[in-house]
């Protein structure tokens, strides 16, 4: 699967049922030495004049299933 195919998928936490946003709005954390994806930050991570919005960091290994329209994650 190409990374671009993940952009429109919703991220759902299977433990809580929480919708964590769209993968295309996430920032990836990549290991500079190996090039592996370590984690991604879901939700709004933009900077506003008054406050910085913080997303939730999700480890790449916590992805349990990538379906046709969503990504299922599980808490560690």
Where are these regions (language model features)?
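Peripheral interaction segments used for macromolecular assembly
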Residues: 1-76
């Amino acid at each position: 699967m190409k990374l671009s195919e993940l952009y429109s998928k919703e991220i759902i936490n299977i433990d809580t049922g929480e919708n964590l946003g769209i993968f295309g709005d996430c920032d990836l954390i990549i290991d500079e030495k190996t090039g592996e994806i370590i984690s991604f930050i879901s939700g709004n991570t933009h900077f506003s004049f008054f406050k910085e919005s913080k997303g939730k960091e999700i480890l790449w290994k916590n992805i349990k299933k990538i379906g046709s329209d969503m990504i299922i994650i599980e808490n560690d």
